[in-house]
């Protein structure tokens, strides 16, 4: 055996296997998901990621430099503009997806099809939506062992607040009744 390599038992490796049939979607992992155009199902596969839901279930909890989620939504639905302090990669599995970035008149967009890939740099405001005609799935990967939280435009936070959601000091979702 080479120096620096490990041997793992099957039981040890099975803690690092996520079966699609066992995954349960989280429809309120982010503050924007209560807004109709941003409804989506999120599946945290590897690592907690940047979830604003402290009770978010994760399939594989060992995190070694990245977090991965599956994203599913109906046509026209997706995620609001937001930013991360780390890189974010999007890979469509099914359907067509619009990945858009920058705010206002500086806005740009690219349409991705299955197995295309885009890597959005840290700090760039980005969003996405299903640009196809059927429910579609995409993989999202956020870099870093500690992916921190999302930065949202003030308009999105205000609209979410109007639905009864807000973020606490740690960046976790609170219902209005729990926040008061």
Language-model-detected regions and their locations in the chain:
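A short, N-terminal "cap"/entry segment at the start of jelly-roll beta-barrel domains
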Residues: 1-65, 168-180
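Double-stranded beta-helix
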Residues: 2-15, 127-180
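Conserved short histidine dyad/triad with adjacent acidic residue
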Residues: 50-55, 67-84
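Short histidine-centered beta-strand/loop micro-motifs
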Residues: 57-61, 79-84, 101, 109-111, ...
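A generic "binding-loop/recognition-motif" signal
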Residues: 75-77, 85-86, 124-125, 134
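Histidine-centered metal-chelating micro-motifs
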Residues: 78-80, 98, 117-118, 122-127
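Glycine- and acidic-residue-biased ligand/ion/polar-headgroup-sensing regions
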Residues: 85-98, 103
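Short acidic-glycine-tyrosine-enriched beta hairpin
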Residues: 103-121
């Amino acid at each position: 055996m080479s120096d620096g390599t490990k041997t793992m038992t099957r039981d040890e490796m099975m803690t690092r296997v996520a079966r699609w049939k066992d995954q349960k979607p989280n429809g309120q992992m982010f503050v924007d998901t209560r807004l109709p155009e941003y409804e989506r199902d999120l599946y945290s596969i590897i690592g907690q990621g940047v979830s604003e839901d402290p009770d978010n279930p994760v399939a594989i909890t060992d995190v070694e430099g990245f977090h991965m989620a599956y994203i599913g939504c109906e046509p026209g639905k997706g995620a609001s503009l937001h930013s991360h302090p780390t890189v974010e990669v999007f890979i469509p599995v099914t359907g067509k997806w619009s990945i858009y970035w920058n705010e206002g008149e500086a806005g740009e967009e690219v349409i991705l099809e299955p197995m295309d890939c885009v890597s959005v740099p840290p700090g760039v405001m980005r969003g996405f939506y299903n640009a196809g005609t059927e429910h579609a799935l995409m993989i999202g990967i956020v870099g870093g062992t500690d992916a921190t939280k999302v930065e949202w435009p003030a308009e999105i936070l205000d609209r979410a607040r109007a639905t009864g959601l807000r973020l606490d000091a740690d960046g976790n979702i609170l219902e209005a009744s729990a926040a008061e």
